């Protein structure tokens, strides 16, 4: 069986030698237990307000005041207490409120009042009108970019994920390298060209596109005591996270 990156939660601990990471990096953490899969007839939104939370996040993001990477990092910056007690969409709304204030779109007082208290930034041209929503959702946010950075690996190469795991540009910054993959050896399955590097883009340091690869790992290379050690896991990994095996 081959698994993609999404939804990889496991009862087993991470591979030996993996360092600790921030709370949001939950793949393979010990003690969280298995995640029961949703049934085929499960509703898209468990509660009505979940749909509104998604709509608010998309409409606010369309204002162009931050990147997707920055919004992810904003949610990662929630206090550990809030992160553990909030539901999925509560994390979204709390991170959204924080980033709206941080970027000057609104103020804390306006959040509390539930209305505008001063002249708002002129963002009317970026307003996501209803007739544009479907097109915006279907087109997504392409991250493929031209880059002068040379790809160091080819399909079939054996690679090792670097152990550092942290953002090398910003202390405590955003990283898309999951803890459970650090130090693991895998094989390059696909090369996707150069894509926006989240470690840089999340902090306003530019898109800094880097080569992006799909790397396949044996499950046993990621988790000791894997129930099905010959299963494979495929992760999309940027070049700065990799080194030759």
Q: Residue ranges of each PLM-predicted region?
A:
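Basic/aromatic-rich interaction segments and small domains that mediate binding to polyanionic partners
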Residues: 29-57, 95, 100-103, 143-155, ...
